[in-house]
Amino acid sequence: MNKRELESAIVTDFSKRMSYGDYLCLDQLLDCQHPLSNPQHHDEMLFVVQHQTSELWMKLMLHELQAARILVQQDKLSHCFKILARVKQIQRLLFEQWAVLETLTPSEYVEFRDVLGNSSGFQSHQYRSIEFLLGNKNAAMLAVFSNDADKHAALKAILEAPSLYDEYLLYLSRHGLPIPQECIERDWTQPYQRNPDLLPAFKEIYDHPQKYWEAYEMAEKLVDIEESFHLWRFRHMKTVERIIGFKTGTGGSSGVSFLKKALELTFFPELLDVRTEIGA
């Protein structure tokens, strides 16, 4: 018989117990999808769920990156490795998730795009927080959140604090590696700028990985995140190109052209630059 009997020990009475749905607040979570098209367009639910689930994964990613930054401050680099490995897997999921949205055709999307108004992923507070934490800082982005005091304050705090890479460089300096002062005594609100004088420190690490094992492993974990972010940005750009072509974005950007510019941004430039020097 194609049937699995319910085991007698399985709990079924939740009148006085916390259930799966209670723990996860599923009633509230599953009541957050409110397509605005009228009559409701079938594919708008896909669009809403795609972006809401992305925000949930970004919430976890932000949680992990903030924890990693604190651990680096505390000189606990090895404790970061599992955290950053998890971040990489979250990035992989976010990358693959674009494939679901790509099932939305241009002719389908245009039928409900107007209901978005000026809302845009560019306005994602969590995404901007992640970018700032990784070092791509831009104070002008705060203006997007000028009407939300809490979000503005939270993002401003991240803007004014050292990024994860800044903390890594401070760690290397504390452990005797030749880190240029301008890399670790600077205005944290500014985006990090490539510094060729940092390469000798990274070359030392890569030439002697056993001696600097934790610093070496941390560098590779950061490169993983950098690469994954670039792949995500590229997939984002190609998905937008596939669905709306070269139309302007709902938030007012130039669309694909604006997204292409993000492909030139780097978080940890010297970790890639040093590869040319290894073995030279």
UniProtKB/Swiss-Prot annotation:
Entry keyword annotation includes Protease: no
UniProt-listed GO biological process terms: L-tryptophan catabolic process to acetyl-CoA; L-tryptophan catabolic process to kynurenine
InterPro entries: Trp/Indoleamine_2_3_dOase-like, Trp_2-3-dOase_bac, Trp_2_3_dOase
Binding site for heme: 236
Enzyme superclass (EC): oxidoreductase
Residues reported in the UniProt entry to bind substrate: 47-51, 109, 113, 250
EC number: 1.13.11.11
GO molecular function: heme binding; metal ion binding; tryptophan 2,3-dioxygenase activity
The record's free-text note on cofactor binding: Binds 1 heme group per subunit.
UniProt-listed HAMAP family: T23O
UniProt-recorded name of the protein: Tryptophan 2,3-dioxygenase
Source organism: Serratia proteamaculans (strain 568)
Lineage start: Bacteria, Pseudomonadati, Pseudomonadota, Gammaproteobacteria, Enterobacterales
